[in-house]
Amino acid sequence: MNAVAHGETDILQLLLEILAKTCSAYCVIGGLAVSAYAEPVVSLDVDVIVTADKVDAVTAAARAQALKVEQLEHRVNLTSEKSDLRIQLQTDPRYQEFLSRAVQKEVLGYPLRVASVTDVLQGKVWAYLDKSRRRSKRQKDLADIMRLVEAHPTLEAQLPPSIGQKLNE
């Protein structure tokens, strides 16, 4: 992953160290989580949930490690000049319940806590249905939903009808 991200610094490993140092429960969601359950696809975005009461500790530790911290409405972006990889701490409260169902998986060579497959699907459905997101992002979310359903066909029954129809077009 570090080579793909043109990284002088392994920012994902740095994040794992920050999470351990701050004793933060976490799980990966988004495209990287999809890769844990379907054919892996490399992405330069890593979407992570941490317990709500640890967000400040994680961002403080990230700043101490010279990461740039940008706080937005429902996420905190962590970036480094030494890597193209972007870490997004999702702060939308809907995701907090995913933490209790997360499982340990190896993803692209990293041992990670990953949201359950049904939670990953739910997160992708929320993202796809969010009309405020760019169309290109929503199309990627739909492709990720398709990847999950292809790898786990029983998930199709959990999709809203509008998305199920799109998958069968």
Please provide the spans of the model-predicted regions:
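Compositionally biased terminal segments of proteins
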Residues: 1-169
